[in-house]
Amino acid sequence: MIKKKINKKFVVFIPLRKGSKRIKNKNFALINNKPLLHYTYKEITKIFDKKNIFISSNDPKAKKFSKKYKLQFINRPKSLCMDESKTEDAILHFIKEKKIISENIILLQATSPMRTSKDILGCIEKFINLKLDSIFSIYKEKNFLWRKNKKKLHSISFNYKNRKRAQDMDDIYHENGAIFIFKTNKFIKFKNRIFGKFDFFEMKKSNSIDIDDKKDLKKFINYLK
């Protein structure tokens, strides 16, 4: 797939909200003297021109990073930076603010530092080849999952009364939050990142780490050693 062709049909959106509760300044936590955001930047710039990579944030550090690396920056309004704010609202603001006419948007979270350019390209190729409206990344495993409803437990991925061997269980697909791709015009209509004809793109579990708390951050640091 030609890089020039991809850059004509896709833009990249990276949301960065200041004020993480579990890890202070999470997106700029230093790992090997590089901010967490750098790991996404390093992989996406192997595919996309910097003019097609947009960072939406209320964080001065994000603005400084964008300026340093010549990425596009959107000042996210305070109303879209609350704890209850949805990423979808930030995407709609981005589309309107930058008058986006590109056919498709790729949503990447900085909290998925193990996601590679190969993962992103594979997801783009599946999106194009299957003529999808939206696609999202997952990892696969076999697991015994339970749900607790009030005080009662329910097995949801297996029948505990007729327990199978782990290798005989059906696969469980976990949305890993690393990659979302969707058509711009239909996103405006549905105001959701998954809609229409959709499918998933499978990633390795090792590439699917999502930095949500200090435990995840430590796991990533140990992986890099």
What are these regions (language model features)?
Residues 9-14, 37, 52-55:
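Hydrophobic targeting segments
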Residues 54, 60-106, 115-118, 122:
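Short phosphate-binding loop-to-helix
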Residues 7, 97-103, 128-130:
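Glycine-rich phosphate-binding loop signature in dinucleotide/nucleotide-binding domains
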Residues 108-110:
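Active-site acidic Asp-centered loop
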Residues 1-24:
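N-terminal nucleotide-binding beta1-loop-alpha1 segment
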Residues 84-89, 93, 113-204:
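Conserved core of the sugar-phosphate nucleotidyltransferase
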Residues 36-52:
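A short, N-terminal amphipathic alpha-helix
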Residues 2-4, 189, 200-202, 206-225:
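Hydrophobic helical membrane-anchoring modules
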